[in-house]
Design a protein with these regions (language model features):
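Polybasic low-complexity intrinsically disordered regions
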Residues: 51-67, 75-81, 85, 89, ...
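Basic, amphipathic alpha-helical segments enriched in Lys/Arg and hydrophobic/aromatic residues
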Residues: 60-75, 259-323
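Short arginine-rich
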Residues: 94-97, 309
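Helix-centered, glycine/charged polyanion-binding patches within enzymatic domains
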Residues: 2-14, 18, 204-281, 290
Length: 323
């Protein structure tokens, strides 16, 4: 049996990129800091919910008001009390006779607030790239662990699974326990996507026949599935349907090596989802502030919506630099 060829690339041979639309991108970067983008007129108009007609106490803040406050909290990485003070000062500066939700209300409503889905309208089939990353919820930072040799046992994480389209927008997301299996969450991600899938890209953690079958059912008739087979992979007995693409990839890798296969198959587009994780942790941090699993899920979904909104304001268009 042929051996697998190395896929490592020396850094000096990697393709370099430059931003083409720098003026538009710079305008979008400035827009991300515009507070009025996040405290919209729509939210202000619907700040106080209408009377529901039922007996008893009425809610003082609408779902959109709570969602706006929690968005500002995530965006500026604020504790709940500072979120209350920050939003209250914004409303005063804008000359609005509105009050910010207090921190106890935010904590309670964070358990029930409705976060809109990440669904985007697409004109046709999409290319989907999926992966997962860890978000810390308990434990010391990396520096304390390194300097003071602190135990890594008292640390806990949640796993954020996302799917991005060819433009880099997050179109599906789910938060699971750190022990959550990547492949088992795929059905939930696919259920969030309305458009058919023409190309599916994922890493070796998704190298299962069930994944090929699920993507085949959710995709177009000629859907292309790009998943690198495991190094221990062998030719399957049956290669019917989408599973046949795995056998073709396996044979091609044995022939030309993994690096060349990645170039030919478009697997390098997997970097889009990695870039999404980099953006999430750079903008929102690598952890979750909420303590309950329900609130943590809402916090992560709000974070994904923030990244999509930033992308709408402006994203870079780059081109390869030929040296």
């Amino acid at each position: 049996m042929a051996t697998w060829k190395s896929s490592r690339v020396n850094r000096k041979y990697k393709t370099k990129y430059r931003i083409r639309s720098w003026r538009e991108y710079e305008r979008g970067l400035r827009g991300r800091g515009d507070v009025t983008i996040w405290l919209s007129q729509e939210a202000i108009a619907a700040w106080i919910p209408p009377n529901n007609g039922l007996r008893g106490g009425q809610r003082r803040y609408s779902n959109l008001a709570i969602l706006t406050a929690l968005t500002l909290r995530a965006l500026f990485r604020l504790p709940l009390r500072q979120t209350e003070g920050f939003l209250d000062s914004l409303l005063r500066l804008m000359g609005l006779a509105l009050k910010a939700p207090d921190h106890t209300t935010l904590s309670r409503r964070n358990q029930t607030v409705e976060v809109p889905s990440l669904t985007r309208v697409h004109d046709g089939p999409i290319s989907l790239v999926v992966d997962s990353t860890g978000l810390k919820i308990l434990g010391s930072g990396e520096w304390n662990v390194h300097k003071y040799k602190m135990s890594r046992k008292r640390r806990d994480w949640r796993k954020l699974h996302i799917g991005v389209d060819e433009e880099g927008f997050i179109v599906a997301a789910r938060l699971t326990a750190s022990s959550g299996d990547d492949a088992s969450t795929l059905p939930d991600l696919l259920d969030q996507i309305e458009a058919p899938i023409r190309r599916f890209i994922a890493d070796g953690a998704y190298d299962r026949r069930s994944i090929y079958d699920q993507v085949g059912a959710a995709g177009t008739e000629d859907v292309v599935i790009v998943i690198p087979p495991r190094r221990s992979a062998v030719s399957p007995r049956s290669t019917n349907g989408p599973w046949a693409q795995r056998e073709a990839a396996l044979q091609r890798i044995h022939k030309v090596g993994q690096r060349e296969w990645q170039n030919e198959s478009g697997y390098r587009q997997q970097a889009r989802v990695e870039n999404g994780f980099f953006r999430y942790k750079s903008v929102l941090g690598g952890g979750l502030k909420a303590r309950s699993s329900i609130a943590q899920t809402r916090e992560a979904m709000i974070g994904c919506r923030i990244l999509n909104r930033m992308f709408e304001l402006g994203r870079p268009e780059s081109y390869a630099v030929v040296s």
